[in-house]
Curated annotation (Swiss-Prot):
It comes from Staphylococcus carnosus (strain TM300). Transmembrane segments: none annotated. This is Imidazole glycerol phosphate synthase subunit HisF. Pathway: Amino-acid biosynthesis; L-histidine biosynthesis; L-histidine from 5-phospho-alpha-D-ribose 1-diphosphate: step 5/9. The active site is at residues 11, 130. Belongs to the HisA/HisF family.
Amino acid sequence: MIKKRIIPCLDVKDGRVVKGVQFKGLRDIGDPVALAAYYNAELADELVFLDISRTENGHQMMLDIIEETASKLFIPLTIGGGISSTDDISTLLKHGADKVSLNSSALRNPSLVKEASEKFGSQCICIAVDAKWEDERNDWFCYTHGGKQPTDIRVLDWVRQVEYLGAGELLVTSMDYDGVKQGFDHQLLNQINTVVSIPVIASGGGGNAQHFVDLFQQTNVSAGLAASIFHDKETTIGAVKTYLKDKGVDVRWH
């Protein structure tokens, strides 16, 4: 059986790590390189950087951060945010990224998923899905631009399509659960797992170690991603992994 992974996520804006609740109200958390080194020592299985900078200067700072971070990490580094071409992907990989996460650009141009997976390999291409339940339309829909822009694309249709186009992994964020620390969106995740066979990383709602136990016992996702509880030192990745192991969940130990 594949061991379950715990992944911290760092939202980086203009060179600083920030965090909000349900994609709003950003607050400063700290220096990305220092936090990455901390999580590397804390037994994180991977690290995700999402570049939410709005400026060219912010994106350039991100490349410097990736390069410095990659030189200090012994775990895979995934970069997302503002990636719109295979040239962008190539630049990130050259600066030290192991994987890239595509979201808005893939929804805008699905052929990018196929082109990128063929050029760099499926294992390199993760599709980030910001999913929100809409009562009026009775389904989950994809959102873009950091959760600000609704689309008419149903989540289940989209994940099927990107798997077919060659994506190697999904990073699924439940916008309804994001940052509120009440547990993961099992219903959404189980629906996705019924229509795809590629690994799914669950994001949005992790508030304590029991939430990760519930996630891995009640869904078939391969990893759980969180930010708030780790950034705020409410618990550590090591403590979560120990708790998971005690509850019979097979986790990675480095």
